[in-house]
Curated annotation (Swiss-Prot):
Family as reported in the entry's similarity comment: Belongs to the RNase HII family.
Location of this chain's protein in the cell: Cytoplasm
Residue ranges of every copy of the RNase H type-2 domain listed in the record: 10-198
UniProt EC number: 3.1.26.4
Organism phylogeny: Bacteria, Pseudomonadati, Pseudomonadota, Gammaproteobacteria, Enterobacterales
Role noted for this protein: Endonuclease that specifically degrades the RNA of RNA-DNA hybrids.
Chain positions recorded as a divalent metal cation binding sites: D16, E17, D108
Required co-factors: Mn(2+); Mg(2+)
Protein known as: Ribonuclease HII
Length: 198
C-alpha cells in the first residue's frame, strides 16, 4: 500500500461504499475502527481480492475490529435524493452505528458527508488506508450477499453474476421483463425499460 500519514488521533474510522453504479438494490456502506493490537494481514481494496479471500477477511474484521457498522440507502432513497446524496446518507448511518465514537473519520473518495467529528476524504483510500480497506470489504461482502439473495427471487435477471451493474445481459433482461421493485427508477436504463424516459 502507498504510505498514508494518519491524523494524530487514536480512534480512526475508515468508511467506504459499494453499489453506486448498479441499477438495482441499495448502496451499502461500512465504517470500521481497527484495533492496533490485533492487526489483520492482507487488507486491500475489496475489488482486488478474490471472493474467497474477501469472505475470510470479512469474518476476521468483524472479530478483531474495535467497532464496525453497516449503513445503507435503499433504492427509493436513491431515487428521491440522487445517488451522491444517498451515498452520503448511507455513510452517515454507518458512522452513527459505531458503538465507539471515532475521533476522526477517513472516507474513500473525494467527498465527505457531514459528520459530528473531523473527517477527510482520501482518494484511492481503499488501497492506501487499512481502515478504509476493511470497510470496503465489509460493504462488498454484504452487498454481494444481498444480490445473491435477490437472484433467488428473480433468477431471470442474473443478479448474482453482475451484482446489478448495467451489463449487456442485465440490460437485455430489463428490456425483456421490465423492472423489479428493487430497481432504481431514477437511473436511465430503468427509466427507459419502464417507458419513463423522455
Amino acid at each position: 500500500m502507498i504510505e498514508f500519514v494518519y491524523p494524530h488521533t487514536h480512534l480512526v474510522a475508515g468508511v467506504d461504499e459499494v453499489g453506486r453504479g448498479p441499477l438495482v438494490g441499495a448502496v451499502v456502506t461500512a465504517a470500521v475502527i481497527l484495533d492496533p493490537a490485533r492487526p489483520i494481514a492482507g487488507l486491500n481494496d475489496s475489488k482486488k481480492l478474490s471472493e474467497k479471500r474477501r469472505l475470510a477477511l470479512c469474518e476476521e474484521i468483524k472479530e478483531k475490529a474495535l467497532s464496525w457498522s453497516l449503513g445503507r440507502a435503499e433504492p427509493y432513497e436513491i431515487d428521491e435524493l440522487n445517488i451522491l446524496h444517498a451515498t452520503m446518507l448511507a455513510m452517515q448511518r454507518a458512522v452513527a452505528g459505531l458503538h465507539i465514537a471515532p475521533e476522526y473519520v477517513l472516507i474513500d473518495g473525494n467527498r465527505c458527508p457531514k459528520l459530528p467529528m473531523p473527517s477527510m476524504a482520501v482518494v484511492k483510500g481503499d488501497s492506501r488506508v487499512p481502515e478504509i480497506s476493511a470497510a470496503s470489504i465489509l460493504a462488498k461482502v454484504t452487498r454481494d450477499a444481498e444480490m445473491a439473495a435477490l437472484d433467488i427471487v428473480f433468477p431471470q435477471y442474473g443478479f448474482a453474476q453482475h451484482k446489478g451493474y448495467p451489463t449487456a445481459f442485465h440490460l437485455e433482461k430489463l428490456a425483456e421483463y421490465g423492472a423489479t421493485e428493487h430497481h432504481r427508477r431514477s437511473f436511465g436504463p430503468v427509466k427507459r425499460a419502464l417507458g419513463l424516459a423522455s
